[in-house]
Amino acid sequence: MQGRSLLFAILRIAVATSLLGVAQFCAGQFIPASPPIADPNDKRFDAESEDWSSPALDKSHLTPVPPLSSGIAVKSNCSVEMVRLQWRFGDPIDVYVMKPKGVEKPPVVLYLFGHTADTDLFRDEHFEQGSTRDGFAAVGFVSALAGPRFHDRPITQWFVSELPESLATSAHDVQMILDYLAKRGDLDMTRVGMFAQDSGASVAILAAAVDPRIKVLDVIDPWGDWPDWLAHSPVVPDGERPRYTTPEFLNKLTGLDPMSWLPKVQGKVRVQNALFVPGTPPEAREKLLAAVPAGGTVVVYKTPTDTQEILQNNQILQWIHQGLAQLPPSDIAKLPSLPAAGKKAGALRP
């Protein structure tokens, strides 16, 4: 039942992000901006610089301040710790670290969902139990300009209006979070996976392409092929679309297109695509699927019914867990053996 609840939560996010994103943004025009978080007297990040033209960190200079922990909550089969990380002025990031009981240095999966996602999911008991089942750790956080990370800026700004910033900083965050996790010393950082959806899937592709520490990548409905996506995606309000299809705006995205970076991912890759979720235009969707590197897996769900197999058999995380379990472990306790993955609905590639 835990796996089923986990799948419902993930699919709910996928559908809500694509179908309700515009409605939520429009409604947001009438909601007062959140209170300021950034302290103008905070000089800790004055020397930092960041390159928004690339997902790579080689031209950026980000130095983290000491992490702040909320303490560890011990649950029935896992522990949960919220850690606040920061390496950018006015942008603290709440990272949820969920660890299974009884496993020393477990492999870890990072979770990043769409631009309307909040951190509530990472405090959900079903998610905590389902994501740590089978001896895997889970690390959840949200993208730039999402959830608690939207503050100190005009309410008319959002993930897409600031797309170069949103993509680049979020991809940088993934790498900085991996650095933090490596310093903890309680996770197997030789076996790292990332599970992401929608805009989060785009960020995950960018990060995995430049950071080989991500050994297994499982993404659902990634955005990409920016000229076509911005021109035709229903996520973009028609009244704003002309702003995002100008050469000036598109030029800023040249080095941030998941379609270009996906073939460069070195780890194991699976791209899942739900045709009934309309966030990505058909032509852009096809180009993204065609960009999956050789040996990668593509799964297409034509209707919600096609998801019943993974729903009934609790397989939503089985593929990424198996991929990590097949990698040689570092100095960790042996994981329980996992069942063979079931037949993938609508699989186009082995």
Identify the meaning behind each predicted range.
Residues 201-248, 311:
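Hydrolase active-site cap/lid region
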Residues 59-103:
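N-terminal cap/lid segment of alpha/beta-hydrolase-fold proteins
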Residues 95, 105-114:
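Short beta-strand element of the alpha/beta-hydrolase
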Residues 114-172, 229-232:
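Cap/lid segment of the alpha/beta-hydrolase catalytic domain
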Residues 156-198:
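Gly/Ser-rich "nucleophile elbow"/oxyanion-hole loop immediately N-terminal to the catalytic nucleophile
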Residues 293-350:
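C-terminal catalytic histidine-bearing segment of alpha/beta-hydrolase fold enzymes
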Residues 234, 238-286, 290:
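The feature captures the conserved acid-bearing segment of alpha/beta-hydrolase catalytic domains
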Residues 110-112, 141-143, 220, 301:
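Alpha/beta-hydrolase
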